[in-house]
Amino acid sequence: MNLKFKYIITFLSFVLITLSSCSSNKSSKKIVYKKVETTTPKPSETKKPTETVIAKIETSKPKEEVFKVTLPEVNREFRAAWVATVANINWPSKRDLTTVQQKEEAIKLLDMLEANNFNAVIFQVRPAGDALYKSNFEPWSYFLTGTEGKAPSPYYDPLEFWVDEAHKRGIELHVWLNPYRAHHSSGGPVTSESMVKKSPENIVRLKNGMYWFDPADKKTQDHVSEVVKDIVSRYDIDGVHFDDYFYPYASYNGGADFPDNTTWNAYKNK
């Protein structure tokens, strides 16, 4: 056997030994399969995904404090009746009634208004430059006692009485004034107590016997304003109404113009 052949035999032997070793290593390894049991969770055990709530935080400027006024509840309807005192139309029915009789008549009228669901009365307190209340500006009314400037006896204040009795019944009491009528033709004789005598410079006598304050005269305007302010400041009234707040009807003065050229021009030129 020559040398070359020996080398070949040796090389082949080495290859066989190597292959045998690799095969032996592979066969020594075992693959183990593990059985994994899977279970389906019960519906009650299934957890719902947690909901994530994102709060939106709004940033804004602080609101300014709003000034609020608490007002009394207002009646839905104004159901009022007028109570006229001029010429004793509604109250008092006569000029010579006693204090007790006057009060009884007032209560009867107010009870009637309450029974018929009225919620306000408009009471005439100044029919003709006079007063059916205690006034420091004008005399007691002729229509109350039959004598201008004479107070009721036994004494009481009619306006105060009407306010109290109306409010007891849940009825508002509004005062009614005639701002320019200074003396009514049915108001008896003009006496020293009358505004006609106390303030003649701003009062005009009409041809039908009435006397009228001159609306353009500042003295008239100031006087009427003081009368209203006096009532509002001293009585718990619910409103103020004006009637005959204009120049007299043409028929009152026989169709003649009201003599106010001087005061009217002065008023316009203010």
Positions of predicted regions on the chain:
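Bacterial signal peptide processing site
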Residues: 23-25
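Aromatic- and glycine-enriched glycan-recognition loops and surfaces
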Residues: 97-116, 143-169
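Aromatic-lined carbohydrate-binding/catalytic grooves of carbohydrate-active enzymes
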Residues: 116-154
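C-terminal motif of bacterial Sec signal peptides marking the signal peptidase cleavage site
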Residues: 18-21
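Active-site-adjacent "subsite" loops/lids of carbohydrate-active enzymes
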Residues: 76, 84-104, 164, 174-175, ...
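N-terminal carbohydrate-binding accessory modules
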Residues: 42, 48-104
